[in-house]
Amino acid sequence: MRILLQSGTIINEGRIFKGDLLIHNDRIEKIIEGKLDSVPGDLKIIDATGKYIIPGVIDDQVHFREPGLTHKGDIREGSRAAAAGGVTSFMDMPNVKPPTITNELLREKQQIAKENSAVNYSF
């Protein structure tokens, strides 16, 4: 599927400008300053007038508390909340029970994230 975010305020690479953003198969295909010259008929068009289009945010310190303290939060719900706020990647802290301080525990945590995270992750 191809999607065109049209007439938004794009913030990218230290610049701010009005433009369009073309997405193809969930990936950015093209960033256009101004308007796309010709709009193919197979596009889903989203009017982004008055909206900001920004790169995905990286949150380098989250506390999702999994494993061991999931009553406080977990990777599944925390990553979905992050995605809703524009976060595309997170770095989770090891303050869980047991603490993620061995390679084995790290592999277990990576598996949990692989099965549950809505965004990119690291530990």
Regions found by a protein language model. Give the residues of each.
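Short helix-capping segments at alpha-helix termini
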Residues: 38, 114-119
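Histidine-rich, glycine-flanked metal-binding segment
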Residues: 1-4, 9-56
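Generic structural signal for residues in well-ordered beta-strands
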Residues: 45, 121-123
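Metal-associated gating/positioning segment near the N- to mid-region
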Residues: 51-116
